[in-house]
Every structure is written in C-alpha cells, then in structure tokens.
From Swiss-Prot:
PANTHER family: 5-METHYLTETRAHYDROPTEROYLTRIGLUTAMATE--HOMOCYSTEINE METHYLTRANSFERASE (PTHR30519). L-methionine binds at residues 434-436, 487, 602. 5-methyltetrahydropteroyltri-L-glutamate binds at residues 17-20, 117, 518-519, 564, 608. It catalyses: 5-methyltetrahydropteroyltri-L-glutamate + L-homocysteine = tetrahydropteroyltri-L-glutamate + L-methionine. Coiled coil: none annotated. The gene is metE. This is 5-methyltetrahydropteroyltriglutamate--homocysteine methyltransferase. Gene3D superfamilies: 3.20.20.210. The lineage of its organism: Bacteria, Pseudomonadati, Pseudomonadota, Gammaproteobacteria, Enterobacterales. The active site is at 697 (proton donor). It comes from Sodalis glossinidius (strain morsitans). Pathway: Amino-acid biosynthesis; L-methionine biosynthesis via de novo pathway; L-methionine from L-homocysteine (MetE route): step 1/1. NCBIfam families: met_syn_B12ind (TIGR01371), PRK05222.1 (NF003556).
Length: 758
C-alpha cells in the first residue's frame, strides 16, 4: 500500500499578500469585482501547483476564503443574517464582506457579525448566527466552483468541508434561546447535497473537518456525530479530520462512525500511533499529521520515520500536515536576511510540503539512500540543541531566583485605588483609548524608509515625534481623560517588542492571516529572552512632556507575546512566558522612573492560550496569571496598571481575570452587545473595567445614543464609579475621519452620563 501525502489547507494570502492588497483595493473602489475574483483564481492555481511540485499527492480545495472559511460555509448554507441581505435573496461576495466588515461596495451597511478566535490560534473566524426554526439551503457555491477549477487544471483534489457538528458548535444563538444542536436535521440535507455534487464530479475523498472532536464535548454533542454521519455516508469517502489536540477520549464515538479515514494531529496532541492503529477499523485510512502546520520549525523527519515505520504494510497510511498550513508563512527561500544557521532550523509552508514528500518517499522505499536523506535533513535540528544562540545562562539564573513575593503588589486594590484617585483626579466615566491611532501611509513610509536606510535616525525621530505630538493634540481637542502616544513607532504590538528583546528573530515575508485582509508577521522565539536596553521610555517620556493629563505607557504582555510569536519547542510555554515577564518587568520599573503613572500591559491573547481541553485549563491559567503579575507587580501602588483583552469570552475564567489584579481592565464587548457583562450577574469583579463601547473592526461610526445605551447597560452590572469609557480595541487599522467622529461621540456620551449623576 503506497503512502500518500496531503495538506489540510494552504495559506491564502499569497507570498506578497496579493489577496490582502486586492481585497483592500476592491473595498476602496480602485479595482472591479472581476479583478478581485481574478486575483483569487490566480492565487489558487499557483498554490495548487506549488503544493503538487513540492510533493503533495492530494491537493486541498475549498481551503481558500475571501474573508474566512467559516463565513464561506455560512454562505454555502445560506445562513445570512437578514441585516446583511440588503434586499437580495442570492448571496454574492459583497454579502460576505458585509457580514465580515459591516459594509461592502454594494448594499446597505449593517453591524458586522461577531468575530472570535479560531480554537487556540491567532486566526479569527466570523461567528455563525442561528435563530429558532432556521432553515438552510445550498446558496454560495464557491466550493463546487473551485473544485471545477482544480479538476480543469488536472489536479487530484481533496475538497475541504467544515463538518456540520463543528459548524453548529462554532455558532451562537440570536434572539429567542434554543439548543442550536436542534438545527442539525435541517442542516444535513444541504451537506448531503454538497457531497452529492462532489460525487458527480468524480471526487473520491472529502476532508470533512470536525475540530470540535478534540474538545471535551457534552454527551449530546458526541451523540450528534452519529446522527450526522449516518446521514452523510455513501456518496464519497470521508476523511474525518481533527486537529489542534488529541482525540483518544473520543475514539469510542469516532470508531463507530461510517467514515473511511481519520486524520489525527500528532504534533499538538499526544495520541499514540500504535494505539490508534489498534483501535481504528482495519479498512480505514490513518492520516498522520506529522508536519507542524502552526509553527516554523524544521521537522525531525528521522524521528517520524522511526515512529511510522512499524505501521508499514499493516494499514493504509497517509502523511499530512498537523493542521492547515494557513497558520504558517509561505516560503522560506525568500528570506534572504536570516542568518544561515538560524534559517536552517526553519520550514515554511512550501518547505513543509517538501518535508511530506521526503518522508513519504522514505517510507515508500525505506532503503539506505532515502534514510540517509532524512538524516541529512534532520542534522540542523540536532545542532540547534547545543547552539549558543539558544541558551543564555544569565536568564536561567534569574528564573531560578523568582519568589512568590515577586508577583505581589504591595497593597490590595482598594488601597491602591485610593492612592490613584488622589494622584490623577479623574472624572466619573473616565475616557481613554486602547493605545494605537491610525497608521497612516506617512507613518508606515517613515518606518520603512528608516528600516531600509533611506532615512537617518535623527530625521526618523523627528518624524515620529511629530506624529506623537499630533496624537496628543487630537486627544486634547477631543477631551479624552487618559491619553496615549499613538504607537506611531510600532509596526505590530508583538513584533515591536520582539525586535528589542534578545531571543527573537524576524522574517521579511513571514506573513500569516489574522482575519479578513489583516495579516501579521509573527516573531520567532529561538532562544532565551532578555532585555538588553529600555524599549518604550523615550517616546513615553516625550508624549508625557506634551500634556498635563496622564499618558499611558504601553506594553504587550508576556502571554500575548508568547501566543502571537512562533515559540520554541524545546522548552515549556510557561518558561518562555516567565522569561518575557522578567524582561518587561524591568520596562515597567523604567517607565515609572520616567514619570509615567499609568501603564497598560495588553493581554488580548490570554484566553487564546487556554488548552482546548477544559481539564487542562487550571495549570495554564496558574502560570499565565503569574507571568502577568510578575511583569506588573514591580509597580508602586499609586501607579495604575491597565490591561486590555479583546475577541474574548471570559465568563468561565473570571476568577483568573480577577487574579491578574490589574487596576483597570478594558475588554471587547461591542460586537456581542455587552453579552460579556452577563457574567457580572454571578461574579462581583473587584476592580475597574472599561467595556468597549464601539467596534473598531468596522469603519461604521457609532452614534452617541448607541454608546450611552451600552454604558447604561454596563452600569446595571458594574458600579458606575468603577466604569471606564473606551473603544473595544486599538485604532491602528482605522482612518482619522471616522476615528475623530467615533471618539467625539464617545466623549460626548461620557459627559452626558456624568451630567445625569446626582
């Protein structure tokens, strides 16, 4: 039985972010819809051919998305909220953009759908909305159209379909409460129709993604898999696909399903190959996810060869990426500025495809020559274990000296709050922003010219100073109470700090999609982390010199830097987080010395870092909270520590949020209509909180009345004297006109509420 290779998906955006540029040009009216669609066709054709050339046998089709693959599935099922239909019965690409962004070149603007994290990754999906008695039908035929494209190009295709149970799990009920699982019978006929259409096209295998199986599901949801797959059997072979964690706790359900194969993530999970082989039906394909789709490290092919070799000839075996390569940069060969030793440690999406081909060849013909190739390929991995670039004895020594007292503020919140009120004398309903202001073309050009040597340091600092001054003037004019310097010097909230810390390296083209057209270029943590010199002090001190109002020092927290970087795999995540916390602890002390009295330590990724299995949460939360406190606790009691979190649901981790002991927490609540605040019915949050009052991910300007309504709703759950008024996230991606108007409405709303107070 010859072993086949496949990937679960490929990056969509293009090596040079061609999709992002086309999307944004279309939204701005600079290119036609036809030109946008043509860009998508070109990217798909290129990516299929690149995977094939690298050694992938079965090509994923349906992994491409114009905004998000969950949103694509919603349109396929005609699950379009009424507010986004804009009078049209049939969906088109603008329908999709209205759901994702709140507006599109055609149709009426409407509130965008809620966006949240994709499992425990830094990718975001658009949350499906479900209503009581909802019906589904085959609407958007993107998957079928793209299968036709790939077949016309002569490719051996494996369509990718988000499974029905996971789709329901990922959504939310809107309106009258009901069990969304009750929609499964209405959903299955559309899935059957899609599978039937694929069968008509001669499709042999369909990859049906049921990522929810890695979770610890309620029994009703486990049983739903039986109902779903009994209904879907018989038209094509189904590869039940799981990833991001182990599935051994679900094998009793999985092995009873009428599918023909199972894909298991052997990188993120700890499933045992021998045990999987023993428990799976003998006729099933076992797809081994051995190439890490979520990180950039070269795979130890020699080790995987030894683990997989005992299965040769015993069952049909496929080799795959652990998950979609969506989470990986595209091509390492374009990185011309990386040190050659460090570069030899990495593999990006195309190199990962080649790894699959190399391992497949060795397993199909396990002769000495092929095994020697594996050994040669894996040599840099062994060399890295002893590299001086990786290990710093001083960092290890400092970690060993940490005590419990290092993560404790001097006094409890109530005593600190009294000192802070006396120091800052802020009004009721104090207003602030989250940190960043619009990153204009001028700002980006200034940074780029400096980075490429076209601008000297003096002129660069002068330029950045002018933008900081403009940000302070704008905020003073608007009447905000606690100001920010605007972060003109920062390209990305994680990359900026990584550039100033030892232990990180950076890429030129290592872009990955975050959501929609938003791409990020995560740093890579290659070794022990330390701070060689102060990072933010110069700009914070300058901004504070321009105003009598407090200006926040802005730091990215240790857990977020960890989660939004490609981490090391040779030490624990806890160890990495503590190293970052110690480095940034020194930055907090330096900010205080520079006269900064309000310091924000952003942790938007705190929930994202949670293990997928609830039983493993407490261990993670213990060290994540400790890392934040280790970072912050050096501050004096009259220094106000803020933190910010976004895209999150906190109802089930409120104890840990409170344990951070931040004086003020700002959170994303606008897209979910303050839904998060429902948790305060049960949980008496002790400190101050700023529920985000408008959605910065949409260009729509919130009305003063809308903001007042949200704040009144918040005041029903949290005492008004502990409420702050702020957007739900930074304003980096917005334009100045909408930013000014939105903030003006926000400040006016806060003043109105102050006037209403007795």
């Amino acid at each position: 039985m010859a072993i086949l290779s496949h990937t679960l998906g490929f990056p969509r955006v293009g090596l040079h972010r061609e999709l992002k540029k086309a999307q944004e040009s279309y939204w701005a009216g600079n290119i036609s819809q036809q030109q946008l669609l043509e860009t998508g066709r070109e990217l798909r054709a290129r990516h299929w051919q690149q995977q094939k050339d690298a050694g992938v046998d079965l090509l994923p089709v349906g992994d491409f998305a114009w905004y998000d693959h969950v949103l694509t599935t919603s349109l396929m099922l005609d699950n379009v909220p009424a507010r986004h239909r804009s009078g049209a019965n049939e969906s088109d690409i603008d329908t999709l953009f209205r759901i994702g962004r709140g507006r599109a070149p055609t149709g009426e603007p409407a509130a965008a759908a809620e966006m949240t994290k994709w499992f425990n990754t830094n990718y975001h999906y658009m949350v499906p909305e479900f209503t009581l008695g909802q019906q589904f039908r085959l609407g958007w035929t993107q998957l079928l159209d793209e299968v036709d494209e790939a077949l016309a190009l002569g490719h051996r295709v494996k369509p990718v379909l988000l499974g029905p149970v996971s789709y329901l799990w990922l959504g939310k009920v809107k309106g009258e409460a009901f069990d969304r699982l009750s929609l499964l019978p209405a959903l299955l006929p559309v899935y059957k129709q899609v599978l039937g259409e694929l069968a008509k096209r001669g499709v042999d295998w369909v990859q049906i993604d049921e990522q929810a199986l890695v979770l610890e599901l309620p029994q009703a949801w486990r049983e739903a898999y039986r109902e779903a797959y009994q209904a879907l059997q018989g038209q094509t072979k189904l590869l039940l696909t799981t990833y991001f964690d182990s599935i051994r706790h679900q094998l009793d359900i999985i092995t009873a399903l009428p599918v023909q194969g199972l894909h298991v993530d052997l990188v993120a999970g700890d499933d045992d190959l021998t045990e999987l082989h023993r428990q799976l039906p003998a006729e099933w394909v076992l797809s081994a996810g051995v190439i890490n789709g979520r990180n950039v490290w070269r795979a130890d092919l020699q080790s995987w060869f030894e683990q997989l070799r005992p299965l040769l000839g015993k069952r049909e075996l496929w080799l795959g990426s652990s998950c979609s390569l969506l989470h990986s940069p595209i091509d390492l060969s374009t990185e011309t500025q990386l040190d050659e030793e460090v570069k030899s440690w990495f593999a990006f999406a195309l190199q990962k495809c080649a790894e699959l081909g190399l391992l497949r060849a060795a397993l199909n013909a396990p002769d000495e020559a092929n095994q020697a190739r594996l050994g040669e390929y894996s040599a840099p991995i062994r060399a890295r274990r002893h590299s001086s670039r990786v290990h710093n004895p001083e960092v290890k020594a400092r970690l060993e000296k940490i005590t419990a007292a290092d993560s404790q503020r001097q006094q409890p919140y109530a005593a600190r709050a009294a000192l802070q009120r006396a120091r800052f004398k802020l009004p009721a309903w104090p207003t602030t922003t989250i940190g960043s202001f619009p990153q204009t073309t001028e700002i980006r050009g200034l940074r780029l010219d400096f980075k490429r040597g076209r601008l000297d340091g003096g002129h660069y600092r002068t330029g950045i100073s002018e933008h900081i001054k403009q940000a302070i003037v704008e905020q003073e004019r608007l009447g905000l109470d606690v100001l920010v310097h605007g972060e003109a010097e920062r390209n990305d909230m994680v990359e900026y700090f990584g550039e100033h810390l030892d232990g990180f390296v950076f890429t030129q083209n290592g872009w990955v999609q975050s959501y929609g057209s938003r791409c990020v270029k995560p740093p890579i943590i290659i070794g022990d982390i330390s701070r060689p010199e102060a990072i933010t002090i110069e700009w914070a001190r300058y901004a504070q010199s321009l105003t009598a109002k407090p200006v926040k020092g802005m730091l990215t927290g240790p857990v977020t830097i960890l989660c939004w970087s490609f981490p090391r795999e040779d030490v624990s995540r806890k160890t990495i987080a503590r190293q970052i916390a110690l480095a940034l602890r020194d930055e907090v002390a330096d900010l205080e010395q520079a006269g900064i009295g309000v310091i924000q330590i952003d942790e938007p990724a705190l929930r994202e870092g949670l293990p997928l299995k609830h039983s493993a949460w407490q261990d993670y939360l213990t060290w994540a909270v400790e890392a934040f406190r280790l970072n912050a606790a050096v501050a004096q009691d009259d220094t106000q520590i803020h933190t910010h979190m976004c895209y999150c649901e906190f109802n089930d981790i409120m104890d840990s949020i409170a344990a951070l002991d931040a004086d003020v927490i700002t959170i994303e609540t606008s897209r979910s209509d303050m839904e998060l605040l429902e948790t305060f019915k049960e949980f008496d949050y002790p400190n101050e909180i700023g529920p985000g009052v408008y959605d910065i991910h949409s260009p729509n300007v919130p009305s003063e009345e809308w903001i007042v309504e949200l704040l009144r709703k918040a005041a029903q759950r949290i005492p008004a004297e502990r409420l702050w008024v702020n957007p739900d996230c930074g304003l980096k991606t917005r334009a100045w006109p909408e930013t000014r108007q939105s903030l003006a409405n926000m400040v006016t709303a806060a003043r109105k509420l102050r006037e209403e107070q007795p």
